[in-house]
Amino acid sequence: MSKRDYYEVLGVARGASDEELKKAYRRCAMKHHPDRNPGDAAAEAAFKECKEAYEVLSDGNKRRAYDAHGHAAFEHGMGGGGGPGGPDMGDIFGDIFGNIFGGGAAGPRAARRGADVGYVLELDLEEAVAGIERRIEIPTLIECAPCHGSGSEDGKVETCGTCHGRGQVRIQRGIFAMQQSCPHCDGRGTLIQNPCKTCHGAGRVEEDKVLSIKVPAGVDTGDRIRLAGEGEAGPAGTPPGDLYVEVRVREHAIFQRDGDDLHCEVPIRISQAALGDTVRVATLGGEAEIRIPAETQTGKLFRLRGKGVRSVRSRSEGDLYCRVVVETPVNLTADQRELLQQFEATFTGEDARKHSPKSATFIDGVKGFWDRMTS
């Protein structure tokens, strides 16, 4: 049977970058990995195919040879450096699967740990600031109870006679010697003659796990909480992976967060801005007062020390910044409109410049601009 194009195997364009190749290989390998598809011959073949494709395309010399000659580049010694499967893949697997399966390709698969699991936890701002204990439910692989994770119905596990329990075999390709996973035991180092009827020899079963998570006060979007040993159960009774809970804080109707500081807008009336007043504002700890001085303009910031968020790391407290917005009155009555018209009539001549200096400066600027344009 003819081999598929390596770029097609990984699902990338021929001009794909090294990073795109690596991501594509990660997706392909994770999808077809034998640990996730126990007993599935088609998945195992697909896994080996994407492994071979990545080995060639991730090597600059081999990729150039493949682009020029296709699969023929690795027949009869062409291409140099051995054909696909030549070099030890330990470094690649250590990089890509190191954090997922607990190590590189060296040694029996039994030395690997379970996969880490990710979970996104959404919180309201108040919950993130105060801290909370939350119960979550996650689908994951847990140790098979009937066989205690061994994968064997009777608990008996035999040492592989091909690799003698090492999970690796040494092969020679021309002048190159390499280690690869034992094809007889699939790198486990052991064989199961009587597979467990519950897990079919995998040693693990899918189940929804319920956990209680204590979220510390002050967390923010992007913070991660690690729960050691709460990830997927390891294959063949090996240690489990970890659970990483990523926090996402929902947008708040009043406050915007910037680190440990909070920001909000405080609308005030024209009369309050002109004459001054004391207004009450909301904080996460209750109400507080702000004294608005006379002649306050839109955009003025008022700082309330210690009314922000207590830092999850240093335990110091942030501040609350209140930005004043002078609100234009709407739905005026006839009397209110008349009073405002009378008030506006007082802004004439130099009085207008004195009471509205920014407006006067703006008008002068516009007049000067047109004078220069028409002169």
UniProtKB/Swiss-Prot annotation:
One of its GO terms (biological process) is response to heat. GO terms for molecular function: ATP binding; heat shock protein binding; unfolded protein binding; zinc ion binding. CXXCXGXG motif repeats lie at residues 144-151, 160-167, 182-189, 196-203. Gene3D superfamilies: DnaJ domain, Heat shock protein DnaJ, cysteine-rich domain, Urease metallochaperone UreE, N-terminal domain. It is found in: Cytoplasm. Disulfide bonds: none annotated. CDD domains: DnaJ (cd06257), DnaJ_C (cd10747), DnaJ_zf (cd10719). A zinc finger (CR-type) spans 131-208. Zn(2+) 1 binds at residues 144, 147, 196, 199. It comes from the Bacteria. One of its GO terms (cellular component) is cytoplasm. Its cofactor is Zn(2+). Keywords: Chaperone, Cytoplasm, DNA replication, Metal-binding, Repeat, Stress response, Zinc, Zinc-finger. Zn(2+) 2 binds at residues 160, 163, 182, 185. Residues 5-70 form the J domain. PROSITE patterns: DNAJ_2 (PS50076), ZF_CR (PS51188). Binds 2 Zn(2+) ions per monomer. The J domain is necessary and sufficient to stimulate DnaK ATPase activity. Zinc center 1 plays an important role in the autonomous, DnaK-independent chaperone activity of DnaJ. Zinc center 2 is essential for interaction with DnaK and for DnaJ activity. NCBIfam families: DnaJ_bact, PRK10767.1. Belongs to the DnaJ family. Homodimer. HAMAP family: DnaJ (MF_01152). Participates actively in the response to hyperosmotic and heat shock by preventing the aggregation of stress-denatured proteins and by disaggregating proteins, also in an autonomous, DnaK-independent fashion. Unfolded proteins bind initially to DnaJ; upon interaction with the DnaJ-bound protein, DnaK hydrolyzes its bound ATP, resulting in the formation of a stable complex. GrpE releases ADP from DnaK; ATP binding to DnaK triggers the release of the substrate protein, thus completing the reaction cycle. This is Chaperone protein DnaJ. It comes from Xanthomonas axonopodis pv. citri (strain 306).
